[in-house]
Amino acid sequence: MKLNFLHLLNQLKSVCNKFDGESNDAKIIFLETLSTKPVPFNKNTSEYLNVLLFLCAHSGNAETLILAESELKRISLALKKASRKEKTQLVNSGLPFTPSLSTYTHELLQWMITYPKINIGIDSFYKSEVDLSTSLTLTLPSLEKEYTGMSYNNKGLLQILQVPKESQLSFILSEFSKLNDQPFVKDYFFNALQLYVKLIPKDEAFSKAYNRMPLQGHFFHTEIIKQFDQLALLNKKLPLPKKLSAHQFKDVQTVIKNSLALLQRETDPVTYMDERSFKLYELERGISIAIYGMKAERQLPLESYVGYTLFKNGYPAAYGGCWVFGKRALFGINIFEPYRGGESGFMMCQLLRVYRQAFGVDYFEVEPYQYGQGNPEGISSGAYWFYYRFGFRSLEPVLNKLAESEFEKIKQIKGFRSTEDTLLRFTESNVALQLGKRVPLTVAEVRDKVTAYVSEKHAGNRVQAEKIVVKNTLEKIEKIKLLTKQQKKVLSETAFMCEVLHIHSASKIKAVHQMVLTKSEDLYAYQQHLLAALK
């Protein structure tokens, strides 16, 4: 019987994460047979891309890798020759030479218009909450501001300002750049425009198939590792970060940005990356992890939002971040669709290892969305048990007791699955992995103490309260140089922290002083000084 493309694809999917001899042989046979089939310009192509990416990242031998990469090239060539209609049918698929249509932040679009691998232009203003006239009132030269009051729609305003169609996106971005010193004002008005752009790849580089980090060596799999000593891995000393040339760093940064842009997503640490904070660790089993913080004007009060991208044999396989405050971190993980069904637990533990050692974190907390709250996939996959198996426990004692009972059934009764109602109950509480002896303080607890302090001691007068706590802190710091705008902001935050946490000793005040000086300059030094202040 002659097998069709979809049947062969399903057969390949059934063996792609198996590494016995028979399965390895089957992968080769299915890939060779699929290579004789025409490339379908439909959702099956996207599904095939996912399987090929999994095989490239988890190949068992060189022959499988070569065949998978050859199929990626064949798909790319077919799509390059495809008609505009055929490509448009695959919009937002991330396949080579297919368009993407989405909204992005001003900052990322500023980067995109300089990226040489794509053409980019305005598609539409879709359900804008604020029109262009209102926004440009803040930026246009005073002689032209009168135009913004003449009831022009967005298209009409651009015409009266005589902006050529091909320059309209760069014009809008340039105007909003005038608000860079007021980033949150800029964000509000720019995001409210609901400006949709269309990205047309010039070559295969802007695609999920070829958005990868160059490799010196490839790790070939003999198995998908499920069982390992988690604690030993978390405590295994990290290697030194990889030294990158300016060119290498630019390449990796491009891969990181494109990995999310191809999904029509962004995270703040990727979009507002502080390049000085970037570190890349090359770890076991083909895993590399990049971590990075945010520019000073985008940083959060007291805590540090540190993003990551995890690579598997050079392919971006997971992204997310940690909100780090002292020994505590709120952790989130998102595994890109092609790489699910692989070594998810090992990948997560490698991430925890990096944050544990780079920042001294010994308490990781995960919010319920990750395992089902407002996330049906998290419920259907039983994601709660993924975290449970790696030591995470519900913060609510009642739920923890229920989990113990359910997990015992899972171990004792073959095929037992928790009901949907039970899994939804687990989403009523965060889960946490506690590696130290104490549960560390949260930023929310500091915030609540500050609110209570201002209310009780200053009758809610926040201006007065800030002046007093800053004055008290400065008096304890022996010498302090002229502070920048960002350092003054940090001084206010840390002064309130000192007041409500009763930080008075000379050594801790010295640490607080260093926090003020380093937060906008050195993510890692800031964290070390914060740990010292909270000790």
Predicted regions and their residues:
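Long, charge-dense tracts
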Residues: W111-V255
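Long, charge-rich alpha-helical interaction segments
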Residues: R393, K401-T422
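Sequence-level detector for tyrosine residue identity
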Residues: Y48, Y104, Y115, Y126, ...
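Long, compositionally biased intrinsically disordered regions
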Residues: M1-L143, Q412-K535
